[in-house]
């Protein structure tokens, strides 16, 4: 991909310009899909802490991805599930992370079909946070 871009930079008026741009577009699509599948795999295998980090990295690298909505939703879901599995002394912080992820999801995708499900995770996270805060006292 870098070589194709270098070629286009060196020869901007080449007759191969459209072909090179098409190849670059296809390669970027493959890289995006590979990054998505890798991040999604952590979630599928119930490695929620790793899933959250990998999905957030995916969102940083590919903010306009066709997978962006699903990735942001899975960040929320993985943070919630990670908080659920955590020890009581760590739950407060992790539920707070899930709540923050809900607000990010709702702000970025206010028309999402998954917004109702996200709201359920938000409610459960708030309940979990309140419970964890009470237990810490």
Give residue spans per PLM region.
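Acidic, polar-rich low-complexity tracts and alpha-helical solenoid repeat scaffolds
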Residues: 1-137
């Amino acid at each position: 991909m870098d070589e194709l871009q270098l070629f286009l930079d060196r020869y901007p008026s080449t007759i191969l310009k459209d072909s090179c741009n098409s190849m670059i577009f296809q390669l970027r699509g493959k890289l995006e899909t590979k990054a998505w599948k890798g991040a999604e795999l952590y979630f599928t295998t119930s490695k929620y802490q790793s899933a959250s980090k990998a999905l957030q990295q995916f969102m940083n690298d590919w903010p306009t991805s066709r997978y962006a909505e699903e990735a942001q939703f899975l960040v929320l879901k993985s943070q919630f599930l990670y908080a659920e599995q955590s020890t009581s002394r760590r739950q407060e912080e992790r539920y707070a992370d899930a709540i923050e992820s809900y607000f990010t999801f709702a702000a970025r995708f206010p028309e999402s079909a998954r917004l109702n499900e996200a709201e359920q995770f938000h409610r459960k996270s708030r309940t979990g946070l309140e419970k964890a805060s009470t237990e810490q006292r």
